[in-house]
Amino acid sequence: MWVRTTLRIERWTKEKTEDDTSSWDESSTDINRLPSWGRGHLLASVESSTDASTLSSEGEFKNTDRCCWKHKCAGHIVRPFSPDCVHHDVHLHSLSHCDCDSRLKDCSEKTNSSSGDVGPTCSRDVDSTCFDIIQSPCFELIPEEECVERFWYGWCKSYRPVSVAVIHHPIHHECGADDLNQEEEEEEEEESKPPIPTQVGPTPTDSPTDTGMSMITGAPDSAAPITIWRSESPTGKSQGNRVIKKIKKKKEKDKEEETDEKEKAKVKKKVKKGKLMKKKSPVKSESPPDLSRSLSPRELARMSESSPDSRQDLESEDSYNDPGREEPSSEDIVESSSPRKREKNGVQVKKPGLKTSPVKKINKRRSPPASNPNLS
C-alpha cells in the first residue's frame, strides 16, 4: 500500500508541473490567467482583480508583474521554513536558483530601458528591495550520491544521485536611478568646491636693480594673499647652489666627526676591558723553592736532626756506612730518649681547645763520643 501511494503522488506532481509549464509559457502575453492571490502579493502597487479581461486593466506595471511572476514560477525554489534539496530554509522569504535571479535582473533592466520615464520605476523598486534590502541569497545544485539500500550490518548496498543546494551570496542590483543620483552628487560637490587660486606675477613698480629675495603681492583673487619668492640677480641660481654645497659639506663633516668619536669611544672601552681582565686574572701561587738545591748538606743534616726519629735514622745510616764506628752507649740512649718525654709532657699540659702554632726546634749536632783508650 505504501508503494502505491508514493507512485500516485509522483504521478500527480508530474502531471501538475507539466500543466503549469504548458499554461505559463514565456511566449504567452495574456496575464489574465494569473490568480488574484498571486498577483496581489507580487507588487503592492499593482491593482489586481478577478474581473480583468484585458492587459490594459493591469496598468503601467504589467511588464514588471510578468517578470516577477516568471521568477516566482521557477522550477527550483526552497520555500521558507521547509527542507528541500538537503537544505532547510530558515528565512522568511523563499530561496531561488541563481539563474532565476539573474533572469529577473535582466528582465527588469529591459523594462527600465523600454520605459520612456527617466525617474524611478516600479521594476527598479522591486529589484532594489529584492536584492539590496532583503538580500535574498540564491543557491546552485550540485549532484551527489545518496544511499538507497543498506546491508544488515550497516554498509550501503546501492546509491542514487541527489541534487544538493549550495548557498551563495545575494546578487547586488545596480539600479540606473542610483547612477543618476551619483552623477548629481558629483556635480554638487564640484560646484561647492572653492576655485583654485592663480599665481600673481611681479608688478611693474619693482625696480630691476634690487638684489636678493623680495616678496611680491598682487591683487588677490581670494581672501588669503599669495606670496612668491624670487631672486632678481642674474647670479641668484649660482648663489643658491653654493649655499646648498656648503650645507652638504657641513653635514658630511658632522658625520665624520660623529664616526671618529664613536671609534675613539670603542677603543677606550677595549682598553678598559683589557685592564679589568688583567686585574681579575688570578695570581699564580709561587711554588716553594727546592730546599735540597739551596741548602748545604750541613743545613740539611741539622734540619733532619730536629726530630729524634730522623736522628736515629741518621745514626743508623752512619753506622751502616762506617763499620769501624762504635755503637752508642746506654747513657747516650737515655739522653736521646729524654727529649721525647719532655715533648710528651709539654703536649699534655696544653689545652685541647686551643690551637698552638708549630714551633720548630733546632738542636745542635753533638759531637760523637770520643773513644776511651782504657776500654779498648
Swiss-Prot record:
Residues 202-211, 284-298 have a biased composition (Low complexity). GO terms for biological process: arachidonate secretion; phospholipid metabolic process. The keyword Phosphoprotein applies. The modification Phosphoserine is found at residues 319, 329-330, 367, 376. CDD domains: PLA2_group_III_like. Keywords: Phosphoprotein. The keyword DNA-binding does not apply. Residues 253-264 have a biased composition (Basic and acidic residues). Residues 180-376 are annotated as: Disordered. One of its GO terms (molecular function) is phospholipase A2 activity. Transmembrane segments: none annotated. Residues 243-252, 265-282 have a biased composition (Basic residues). Disulfide bonds: none annotated. Residues 180-191 have a biased composition (Acidic residues). It comes from the Eukaryota. Residues 230-241 have a biased composition (Polar residues). Belongs to the PROCA1 family. This is Protein PROCA1. It comes from Bos taurus. The gene is PROCA1.
